C-alpha cells in the first residue's frame, strides 16, 4: 500500500496507525524509501478509542489491505465511520462491504490509480458511498441484529 500510495498524485497524507517493530520499520524503509515522501506519516498505535474514532471521522478515506480472516472488526468500524473505503479485492472484504466500497488488487498501479480516481471524485459520489456503508452496517452488523439472530438460534 505504501509503494502504491507513493506512486499516486494525491496531495493528501497517508497516516498509518499501527505498531511496528524497529526491525520491520527499517526493512520497510529499505524496500519503499517512504521517508522521502512527506505525505506518509507513521502515527503509531492509538489505544484511546475516542481519539481513534475522531481520527476515523476526520479521515478522507481508509485503506484495508487484509486478505484473510473473515469479518474484520477494523473494516466494520471503518465502514461505520469513514465515508470512503478502499479495500483489497478479496472475497472476505467484498462479502462485508459489497457495493459500499471501492476495490483494488495487487497489480502494479491498481491502488495508485484508484487513489487518483477518488482524489477527483465529486463529494456527492463520496457521500453515496458513505450512505451505503452506514446502511450496510446497520442492516447487517448491528448489535441488535446479531443478538436477535443468536436469540432465535438458541430458542430454536
Regions found by a protein language model. Name each.
Residues 47, 51, 66-71, 92:
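Active-site donor-sugar recognition loop in glycosyltransferases
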Residues 1-13:
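Short hydrophobic signal-anchor/transmembrane segments that target glycosyltransferases
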Residues 67, 83, 87-94, 106-108:
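Short glycine-rich donor-binding/catalytic loop of glycosyltransferases
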Residues 101-109, 117-123:
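Conserved acidic donor-binding segment of nucleotide-sugar-dependent glycosyltransferases
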Residues 18, 27-50:
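Nucleotide-activated donor-binding/catalytic signature segment of Leloir-type glycosyltransferases, i.e.
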Residues 53, 73-80, 91-95:
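Short alpha-helical segment that forms part of, or immediately flanks, the ligand-binding pocket
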Residues 123-155:
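A charged, aromatic-enriched C-terminal amphipathic alpha-helix characteristic of glycosyltransferases
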Residues 54-70, 83-84:
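Acidic donor-binding loop of glycosyltransferase active sites
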Amino acid at each position: 500500500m505504501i509503494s502504491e500510495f507513493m506512486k499516486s498524485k494525491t496531495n493528501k497524507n497517508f497516516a498509518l496507525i499501527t505498531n511496528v517493530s524497529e526491525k520491520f520499520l527499517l526493512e520497510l524503509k529499505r524496500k519503499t524509501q517512504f521517508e522521502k515522501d512527506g505525505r506518509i506519516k507513521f502515527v503509531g498505535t492509538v489505544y484511546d478509542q475516542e481519539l481513534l474514532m475522531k481520527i476515523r471521522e476526520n479521515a478522507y478515506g481508509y485503506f484495508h489491505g487484509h486478505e484473510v480472516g473473515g469479518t474484520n472488526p477494523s473494516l466494520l468500524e471503518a465502514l461505520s465511520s469513514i465515508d470512503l473505503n478502499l479495500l483489497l479485492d478479496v472475497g472476505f472484504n467484498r462479502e462485508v462491504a459489497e457495493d459500499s466500497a471501492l476495490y483494488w488488487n495487487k497489480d502494479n498501479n491498481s491502488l495508485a490509480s484508484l487513489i487518483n480516481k477518488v482524489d477527483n471524485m465529486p463529494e456527492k459520489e463520496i457521500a453515496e458511498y458513505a450512505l451505503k456503508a452506514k446502511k450496510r452496517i446497520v442492516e447487517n452488523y448491528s448489535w441488535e441484529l446479531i443478538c436477535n439472530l443468536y436469540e432465535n438460534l438458541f430458542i430454536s
